[in-house]
């Protein structure tokens, strides 16, 4: 990632002035010269069970699965580790995120927050907006999430201790539930999935 982009990203997180160096982010492990992430293109029939911050592969491995840059050119053949995110499911944009993404999350553990900061930094630096608009996410309240978690646990899809937080564990459990029911296993709670989970 260019220095200006790193500065902008860290500035958005740390509320630094433009002339200051992003020392706070560097202290958290920010790697100069490495971007936070980028939008990518996925092949038809991609196995969405491979998405989520808990699953990391190097760029060579992602390329072997058919992941490409947005212009369909191959990913750079390096051993840089990345995770694949589809924050609004298979119908929305997909992003490969690198270690610097986790640095942004050091300030706020919400994936949506870190993604917003990274995308804002890209736009300020002259980058393009995501190719597809995010799909609207249903508003889920804590009792609904607890109900979903209880349902998943009771049916053999481990969502962890029911806490009402729609985090990566719950999303992974929904992905397994979707796969078992012949659905696209992207972990995204569409109205149809919520109906099956009894949490409309």
Predicted regions located by residue number:
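Short acidic, glycine/serine/threonine-rich helix-capping segments at coil-helix boundaries
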Residues: 138-145, 153-197
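Extracytoplasmic and endomembrane cell-envelope/extracellular-matrix remodeling and assembly machinery
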Residues: 2-3, 7-150, 154-157
């Amino acid at each position: 990632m260019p220095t200006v982009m790193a500065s902008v990203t860290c500035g958005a997180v740390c509320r630094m002035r433009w002339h200051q160096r992003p020392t706070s982010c560097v202290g958290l492990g920010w790697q100069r010269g490495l971007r936070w992430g980028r939008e990518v293109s996925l092949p038809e029939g991609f196995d969405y069970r491979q998405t989520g911050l808990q699953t990391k592969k190097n760029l060579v491995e992602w390329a072997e699965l058919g992941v490409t840059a947005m212009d369909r050119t191959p990913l750079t053949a390096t051993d840089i580790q990345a995770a694949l995110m589809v924050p609004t499911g298979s119908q929305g944009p997909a992003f490969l995120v690198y270690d610097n993404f986790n640095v942004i999350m050091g300030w706020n553990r919400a994936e949506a927050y870190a993604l917003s900061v990274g995308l804002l930094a890209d736009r300020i630096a002259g980058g393009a907006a995501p190719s597809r608009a995010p799909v609207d996410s249903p508003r889920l309240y804590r009792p609904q999430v607890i109900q979903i978690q209880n349902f998943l646990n009771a049916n053999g899809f481990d969502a962890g201790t029911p806490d009402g937080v729609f985090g990566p564990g719950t999303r992974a459990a929904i992905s397994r539930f979707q796969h078992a029911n012949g659905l696209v296993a992207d972990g995204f709670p569409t109205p149809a999935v919520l109906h099956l989970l009894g949490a409309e």
